[in-house]
Amino acid sequence: MNPRRKQRLTWVAILVIGVSVATGLMLYALSQSIDLFYTPTELVEGKGKDKQKPQVGQRMRVGGMVVEGSVERDRETLEVSFKITDIGPEVTVLYQGILPDLFREGQGIVAQGELIEPTVLKASEVLAKHDEEYMPPELAEQMKGIKHVNPNTVEKGEGQ
Protein backbone atom coordinates (compact mmCIF):
# COMPACT_ATOMS: atom_id res chain seq x y z
CA MET A 1 0.00 0.00 0.00
CA ASN A 2 1.47 3.32 -0.98
CA PRO A 3 1.83 6.09 1.65
CA ARG A 4 -0.78 8.38 0.09
CA ARG A 5 -3.47 5.68 0.13
CA LYS A 6 -2.54 4.78 3.72
CA GLN A 7 -2.91 8.43 4.77
CA ARG A 8 -6.35 8.68 3.12
CA LEU A 9 -7.49 5.48 4.81
CA THR A 10 -6.33 6.84 8.19
CA TRP A 11 -8.28 10.08 7.68
CA VAL A 12 -11.43 8.20 6.63
CA ALA A 13 -11.16 5.95 9.70
CA ILE A 14 -10.73 8.97 12.02
CA LEU A 15 -13.72 10.69 10.39
CA VAL A 16 -15.96 7.60 10.74
CA ILE A 17 -14.98 7.15 14.40
CA GLY A 18 -15.56 10.86 15.12
CA VAL A 19 -19.01 10.88 13.51
CA SER A 20 -19.93 7.67 15.37
CA VAL A 21 -18.89 9.10 18.75
CA ALA A 22 -20.75 12.38 18.09
CA THR A 23 -23.90 10.51 17.04
CA GLY A 24 -23.72 8.26 20.10
CA LEU A 25 -23.33 11.20 22.48
CA MET A 26 -26.20 13.06 20.82
CA LEU A 27 -28.54 10.06 21.08
CA TYR A 28 -27.57 9.54 24.73
CA ALA A 29 -28.31 13.20 25.55
CA LEU A 30 -31.68 13.05 23.79
CA SER A 31 -32.69 9.88 25.60
CA GLN A 32 -32.10 11.63 28.94
CA SER A 33 -34.43 14.55 28.18
CA ILE A 34 -37.24 12.96 26.19
CA ASP A 35 -39.87 13.21 28.96
CA LEU A 36 -42.85 15.36 28.03
CA PHE A 37 -43.55 16.36 31.62
CA TYR A 38 -43.26 15.28 35.24
CA THR A 39 -46.27 14.47 37.38
CA PRO A 40 -46.29 15.91 40.93
CA THR A 41 -45.53 12.44 42.34
CA GLU A 42 -42.53 12.03 40.02
CA LEU A 43 -41.32 15.50 40.96
CA VAL A 44 -41.38 14.73 44.70
CA GLU A 45 -40.45 11.03 44.75
CA GLY A 46 -38.22 10.85 41.66
CA LYS A 47 -38.67 9.48 38.17
CA GLY A 48 -37.62 6.25 36.54
CA LYS A 49 -35.97 3.15 37.92
CA ASP A 50 -33.32 5.11 39.81
CA LYS A 51 -35.88 7.62 41.22
CA GLN A 52 -33.90 10.59 39.93
CA LYS A 53 -35.27 13.91 41.20
CA PRO A 54 -34.98 17.16 39.23
CA GLN A 55 -32.61 19.80 40.56
CA VAL A 56 -33.70 23.22 41.84
CA GLY A 57 -33.13 25.67 38.99
CA GLN A 58 -33.94 23.08 36.32
CA ARG A 59 -36.40 24.06 33.56
CA MET A 60 -39.20 21.54 33.15
CA ARG A 61 -42.86 20.83 32.54
CA VAL A 62 -45.14 19.58 35.30
CA GLY A 63 -48.64 18.28 34.56
CA GLY A 64 -51.56 17.44 36.82
CA MET A 65 -55.00 18.50 38.02
CA VAL A 66 -55.58 21.90 39.64
CA VAL A 67 -56.53 21.31 43.29
CA GLU A 68 -59.95 22.74 44.14
CA GLY A 69 -59.78 25.78 46.41
CA SER A 70 -56.05 26.31 45.82
CA VAL A 71 -56.16 29.15 43.27
CA GLU A 72 -55.04 32.45 44.82
CA ARG A 73 -54.91 35.64 42.75
CA ASP A 74 -53.14 38.87 43.69
CA ARG A 75 -55.59 41.78 43.37
CA GLU A 76 -52.83 44.27 42.41
CA THR A 77 -50.93 42.22 39.82
CA LEU A 78 -51.55 39.31 37.46
CA GLU A 79 -49.74 36.93 39.82
CA VAL A 80 -51.53 33.63 40.42
CA SER A 81 -50.63 30.77 42.74
CA PHE A 82 -52.26 27.34 42.60
CA LYS A 83 -51.53 23.73 43.43
CA ILE A 84 -51.59 20.72 41.14
CA THR A 85 -51.71 17.05 42.05
CA ASP A 86 -52.01 13.61 40.53
CA ILE A 87 -52.61 10.93 43.15
CA GLY A 88 -50.26 12.00 45.90
CA PRO A 89 -48.23 15.08 46.68
CA GLU A 90 -49.17 18.58 45.64
CA VAL A 91 -46.89 20.98 43.76
CA THR A 92 -47.32 24.76 44.01
CA VAL A 93 -47.22 26.68 40.73
CA LEU A 94 -46.53 30.43 40.65
CA TYR A 95 -47.49 32.23 37.45
CA GLN A 96 -47.44 35.87 36.36
CA GLY A 97 -49.82 36.56 33.49
CA ILE A 98 -53.24 35.80 32.09
CA LEU A 99 -54.33 32.20 32.50
CA PRO A 100 -55.88 30.30 29.57
CA ASP A 101 -59.67 30.45 29.18
CA LEU A 102 -59.98 26.72 29.89
CA PHE A 103 -58.10 26.99 33.22
CA ARG A 104 -60.37 25.84 36.08
CA GLU A 105 -60.07 24.08 39.40
CA GLY A 106 -60.26 20.34 38.84
CA GLN A 107 -59.00 20.75 35.26
CA GLY A 108 -55.81 19.20 33.88
CA ILE A 109 -52.94 21.57 33.08
CA VAL A 110 -49.29 21.50 32.08
CA ALA A 111 -47.05 24.25 33.48
CA GLN A 112 -43.64 24.98 32.00
CA GLY A 113 -41.05 26.87 33.99
CA GLU A 114 -38.22 26.69 36.50
CA LEU A 115 -38.16 24.68 39.72
CA ILE A 116 -37.38 27.23 42.47
CA GLU A 117 -37.92 24.87 45.44
CA PRO A 118 -38.34 21.07 45.52
CA THR A 119 -42.15 21.44 45.26
CA VAL A 120 -42.54 24.96 43.80
CA LEU A 121 -42.48 25.75 40.07
CA LYS A 122 -42.26 29.32 38.77
CA ALA A 123 -44.13 28.92 35.50
CA SER A 124 -43.46 30.94 32.38
CA GLU A 125 -46.31 29.22 30.53
CA VAL A 126 -49.51 27.44 31.61
CA LEU A 127 -51.39 25.23 29.17
CA ALA A 128 -54.90 24.00 29.93
CA LYS A 129 -55.70 20.56 28.62
CA HIS A 130 -58.72 20.90 26.39
CA ASP A 131 -59.46 17.30 25.45
CA GLU A 132 -60.53 15.46 28.56
CA GLU A 133 -61.46 12.32 26.63
CA TYR A 134 -57.95 11.15 25.67
CA MET A 135 -55.31 10.44 28.26
CA PRO A 136 -52.17 8.31 27.91
CA PRO A 137 -52.68 4.93 29.63
CA GLU A 138 -49.88 5.50 32.17
CA LEU A 139 -51.31 8.85 33.23
CA ALA A 140 -54.86 7.49 33.33
CA GLU A 141 -53.70 4.78 35.74
CA GLN A 142 -52.04 7.37 38.00
CA MET A 143 -55.03 9.72 37.93
CA LYS A 144 -57.58 7.14 39.09
CA GLY A 145 -59.47 8.35 42.14
CA ILE A 146 -58.94 12.07 41.56
CA LYS A 147 -62.12 14.11 41.34
CA HIS A 148 -62.43 15.79 37.95
CA VAL A 149 -65.07 18.44 37.38
CA ASN A 150 -66.41 18.52 33.84
CA PRO A 151 -66.89 22.23 33.03
CA ASN A 152 -69.65 21.38 30.54
CA THR A 153 -71.86 19.85 33.23
CA VAL A 154 -71.09 22.57 35.81
CA GLU A 155 -72.30 25.29 33.43
CA LYS A 156 -75.56 23.40 32.94
CA GLY A 157 -75.99 22.90 36.69
CA GLU A 158 -75.65 19.10 36.50
CA GLY A 159 -72.27 18.65 38.23
CA GLN A 160 -73.13 20.30 41.56
Curated annotation (Swiss-Prot):
GO terms for molecular function: heme binding; metal ion binding. Heme binds at residues 130, 134. GO terms for biological process: cytochrome complex assembly. One of its GO terms (cellular component) is plasma membrane. The keyword Cell membrane applies. It is a single-pass type II membrane protein. It is found in: Cell inner membrane. It holds the Pfam family CcmE. The keyword Nucleus does not apply. The chain crosses the membrane at residues 9-29. InterPro entries: CcmE, CcmE-like_sf, NA-bd_OB-fold. It comes from the Bacteria. Keywords: Cell inner membrane, Cell membrane, Cytochrome c-type biogenesis, Heme, Iron, Membrane, Metal-binding, Signal-anchor, Transmembrane, Transmembrane helix. Its main location: membrane. Residues 30-160 are periplasmic. Residues 1-8 are cytoplasmic. Heme chaperone required for the biogenesis of c-type cytochromes. Transiently binds heme delivered by CcmC and transfers the heme to apo-cytochromes in a process facilitated by CcmF and CcmH. Belongs to the CcmE/CycJ family. This is Cytochrome c-type biogenesis protein CcmE. The lineage of its organism: Bacteria, Pseudomonadati, Pseudomonadota, Gammaproteobacteria, Alteromonadales.
